[in-house]
Amino acid sequence: MAAVVVMTGCSVMAPQYSASIDNVQKLKDSGDYSAKVGAFTSKPGQGNVNPISLRGSSMNSPYQSSYAKYVEEAIKQELSLANKMAPNANAEVSGTLLKNDLDSSGFSTGTGDIEARFVVKKQGQILYDQVKSAHHEWPSSFAGAVAIPRAIQEYPNLVQKLLASLYADPAFLSALK
């Protein structure tokens, strides 16, 4: 982390995703099914830039330099840990990252916003197509030496919240069965 502090204006790597225990438990408790994860893409636009800019520094995804791949990897991890992942499953989850932004410019609070369209298909038929979003806030600082590393640390929590909102949707879980 100390290296990040002195490297303002440089490029840093986002932390690798770490599965949420609550998300994994929700998937475990959601019934008998298996799923595979298809491709996730990103829709470029304002609020969805790659890399993410943090006060003159840029943060890249550790997964093929793609935040869509970050979300894809997150779902793979959580389905795998819940013993719901199967490469030959009929249900396939895919999606499009629509918004992905961190703001570390606040005096005392940092924020993150993420939005993605999630699609579940079985044998080519779309059973689920919904947009989910999440907002995350954390204590920050006016000092970039504090704010930038903290924003980087908080990114996986933002993705965990996005997936929690997806798994809380009974229609998503029903489409997997």
Task: Give, region by region, the residue ranges found by the protein language model.
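Sec-dependent bacterial lipoprotein signal peptides
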Residues: 1-10
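Short secondary-structure boundary motifs at beta->alpha junctions and helix caps
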Residues: 51-64, 125-168
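Mid-chain, structured segments of secreted extracytoplasmic proteins
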Residues: 62-88, 95
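A structural "domain/chain start" motif
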Residues: 10-69, 73, 171-177
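Short alpha-helical linear motifs
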Residues: 42-44, 114-119, 154-159
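Sec-exported extracytoplasmic/periplasmic mature domains
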Residues: 76, 80-84, 102, 163-171
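Surface-exposed short loop/turn segments
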Residues: 11-22, 81-129, 133-149
